[in-house]
Amino acid sequence: MKPFIAIFLLLQVFLLSAQDQLVLESNLVPGNDTVWVIKPSSYDTSAPYPAVYLLHGRTGNYRSWAELINLQEYADEYQFIIICPDGFYDSYYLDSPVDTSWQFESFFTEVLYPEMAGLYALDKARIFITGLSMGGSGAMYLFLKHPALFLSAGSSSGVMDLNHSSAVHTSLSRLLGDYESNRLLFDSHSPVNQLKNIERSDKHIFFDCGTEDHLYECNNAFRKKCDELKIKATYISRPGKHEGAYWKESIRCHFIFFSNL
């Protein structure tokens, strides 16, 4: 079904250009998806811009990143178009094999991604994706499942193995089925088990995790798997917990990394 798109220009005081709020309707997800697009103030459609899909964590929404950092400043400093979709609170950005109303991976690849390419002057050779926590694992999962769509991906405190998630008996059981009976589905939807998809490619990924984060060992295991498969990966671990104060600082490293590719 062709998505319905409504575009609202959010005029920002003191900014030279508007930020766009789009509403996409699709039967692949349970409701309308609101997408916030932040363009460089100097945005000019005559030249293509690299883009970063920025995914929020569990319980968040399309505006969650704006509560941590000034997205307009990032767009201006790095000259990226920043795209913040709504992950429907706890979609984990995947296609549910048990609930046909939760097909976020298909929504992303079949609706969101092509619509953004059609509406904005994007450099299709320099599309990136990253996020925090659920958004970090979602970003890496989408990248590993569809590496041709992105130049690179990042993750900050991502759930690289869904078996380590605190939501195995709640959100993830709704999406993948009862945890005890569907361990194989939890395994197959984990980024760590999708790394083989870029084993023989020149893709270079970036991820980080705080040393006091409950997902620290999970991310260490992801790094070990990257090393085993000889995948180019930059991994940063530093003091920090699973919280906004950490992500507010860590995300800049992602933009620096992407800008140098």
Report the location of each language-model feature:
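Compositionally biased, low-complexity segments enriched in small residues
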Residues: 1-3, 155
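Non-catalytic cap/lid and distal C-terminal segments of serine-dependent acyl enzymes
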Residues: 19-261
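Sec-dependent N-terminal signal peptides
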Residues: 3-16
